[in-house]
């Protein structure tokens, strides 16, 4: 007859009698399903899960029990606030012998969405958006927060003004003394000298986080991304042809922005619609070896 396997987490006393705020695991690979109107996809996530350990005399928690609850979550038809709450409650219930009363989970994943070209018909590509979900159930109170990352292009307003000045000076010098300049002369000069100076622009990124309602039918990831991209006006593109690149250049020209402008645009687009919106933007400067950043 096989002897029972020892469990030192139950039999060995803790070396010092003190409660622990959180104990658990980080970086667990997990398949999850994200389903929203017009979108359904199984994605790879990494999960961090912990419970509190208020029982000072208990040596350790039961990691495998947390793992089982994550497996159950992966089998859900789709991620939702309700599914996350149920998973956290099950983690707490599985640790009654540890007197646990709180549990938390973080899911990090990349959401893939197909994006059409700006102009060219039947041309599209896939774009990845980093997404993070932070769910906490503490003393019976459930909280869920969503964070998304959005890439965009930013063109410096100051650099654009300096470039326009050089273009103006070049034009005046080229046609100095001519009482009448024909439109085709202007067009010809612009074709040759329109890039006499160009404003510096760079790839930029925004991190936006909001609270989600505990009874929300879905996570609303794509609507949040769409609102941020619309506020900025220059989301980075996927597949493009020359016509799309030209349209993107026009968008950048109409949406000159400092890092402060970007943060304020996003904040204004979220206020009154989402609870506790927070914004962090970063412009990876092409003029400088450092980044410009702002928080709202």
UniProtKB/Swiss-Prot annotation:
The gene is folE2. Keywords: Hydrolase. It comes from Delftia acidovorans (strain DSM 14801 / SPH-1). The lineage of its organism: Bacteria, Pseudomonadati, Pseudomonadota, Betaproteobacteria, Burkholderiales. Its EC number is 3.5.4.16. InterPro entries: GTP_cyclohydrolase_FolE2, GTP_cyclohydrolase_FolE2/MptA. One of its GO terms (molecular function) is GTP cyclohydrolase I activity. NCBIfam families: PRK13674.1-1. GO terms for biological process: tetrahydrofolate biosynthetic process. This is GTP cyclohydrolase FolE2. Pfam families: GCHY-1. It is an enzyme of class 3 (hydrolase). Belongs to the GTP cyclohydrolase IV family. PANTHER family: GTP CYCLOHYDROLASE MPTA.
């Amino acid at each position: 007859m096989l002897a029972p396997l020892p469990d030192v987490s139950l039999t060995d006393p803790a070396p010092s009698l003190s409660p622990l705020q959180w104990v658990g695991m980080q970086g667990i690979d997990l398949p999850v399903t994200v389903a929203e109107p017009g979108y359904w996809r199984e994605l790879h996530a990494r999960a961090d899960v912990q419970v509190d350990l208020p029982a000072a005399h208990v040596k350790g928690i039961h990691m495998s029990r947390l793992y089982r609850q994550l497996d159950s979550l992966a089998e859900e038809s789709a991620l939702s606030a309700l599914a996350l709450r149920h998973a956290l409650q099950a983690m707490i219930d599985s640790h009654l012998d540890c007197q646990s009363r709180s549990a938390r989970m973080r899911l990090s994943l990349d959401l893939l969405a197909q994006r059409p070209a700006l102009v060219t018909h039947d041309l599209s590509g896939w774009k990845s958006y980093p997404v993070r979900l932070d769910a906490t159930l503490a003393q019976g109170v459930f909280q869920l927060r969503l964070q998304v990352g959005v890439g965009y292009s930013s063109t410096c307003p100051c650099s654009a003004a300096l470039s326009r000045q050089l273009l103006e000076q070049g034009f005046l010098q080229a046609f100095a003394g001519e009482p009448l300049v024909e439109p085709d002369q202007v067009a010809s000069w612009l074709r040759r000298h329109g890039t006499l100076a160009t404003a510096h622009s760079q790839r930029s990124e925004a991190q936006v986080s909001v609270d989600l309602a505990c009874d929300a039918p879905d996570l609303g990831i794509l609507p949040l991304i769409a609102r941020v991209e619309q506020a900025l006006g220059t989301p980075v593109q996927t597949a493009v042809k020359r016509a799309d690149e030209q349209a993107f250049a026009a968008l950048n020209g109409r949406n000159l922005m400092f890092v402060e402008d970007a943060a304020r645009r996003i904040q204004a687009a979220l206020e009154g619609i989402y609870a506790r919106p927070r914004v962090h933007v970063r412009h990876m400067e092409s003029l400088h070896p450092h980044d410009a950043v702002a928080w709202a």
